[in-house]
Amino acid sequence: MAASVAELPPPRAGRVQADLLDVVIVGAGPAGLSAALTLGRSRRRVLLLDGGPPRNAPVGAAHGLLTRDGMHPADLKAQALADLAPYDVTVCPDGAREVRREPDGAFAVRVGQDWHRARVLLFATGVRDILPAVPGLRERWGQGVYHCPYCDGWEHEGRALAVYGCGQSAHHLALTVRAWSDRVTLLCDGDPALTPEQTRDLRRVGVRIRTEPVRHLRGGPLEDQPVCVTFRGAPPLLVDAVFLAPEQQQGSHLPAALGCQLNDRGRVQVDDHQETSVPGVFAVGDMTGAPQYVVQAAAAGMHAAQVINTRLIHAAVHSLGAAFHKTPDDGAEVALPPEPDDE
């Protein structure tokens, strides 16, 4: 039975859904949507929990995605949701509040006051950016301040650019941004934390270094002006865009609460099949420390979905094998039929 994409009915307090789903996907970014599409096309019953806008929602366009280069993130998500319509995928706008493993091995996920049960759980909850506490920076995140030159560098190529940060990550990002423009300034905000070798690297390719504390960011696309970086005790700097590599944290506490192991960078640890340290629980996308590109997240979602579908196929075969060897009272072997199909 093919079901259109639909929201769940209003919950009744404390109700446990009787149906056992194949998969619950927590998170509807590119990774979760891609997994839902592949599982839906594999005739699996899926519940996709949305839970909010994608991390790239503030930017005006997503780039680097074949046939969709320059598409607005909201339009990209709307199209992905529409693509799920022919399949048995139910989309809920609410996120998961709680997850637990049941005594029978199934996973229970609380949405509002309702619990939904599934054989497999897939997290695609992403990460949250922790932005520096520079006045004016947060308001311009995605609108004059960016994290990925591969996503937003071309639109500013050849113009005056700045990289905010210090240490190894800023050194790497400044050298990368230099490929788009020969007018790059590194903003160390009072703490350069650069080794002499890193400083030589930057100066060798013409990256200027400003060590003064940054006071404020003004202007930018929000005001149809260049970004004006003001400093304490030094002249301001006008640039077309600022790039930075922010610290990040998990987008949801649920994987860790369920016992999924995190690596030393705080990312959910997965194997080559996207499975976490908890059997039957998978994780995909930015939350695993994979390269943070839309196409990479979508590919990981598709890969995990194929692994999950294969696992479910094998589990059904093994279940039928065990049923076949059950004997009735007369001692004759009998093969139990598979569960009836919804179609």
PLM ranges: what are they?
Residues A36-L37, H171-A174, V284-P338:
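A conserved FAD-binding loop/helix module that cradles the flavin
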Residues R15, L21-A78, R159-A160, G165, ...:
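Beta1-alpha1 glycine-rich phosphate/pyrophosphate-binding loop at the start
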Residues A2-V23, V91-R159, V268-D272, T276:
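FAD-binding core/adjacent interface of flavoenzyme oxidoreductases
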Residues G29-P30, D129, Q168-S169, T288-G289:
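Residue-level detector of alpha-helix initiation sites
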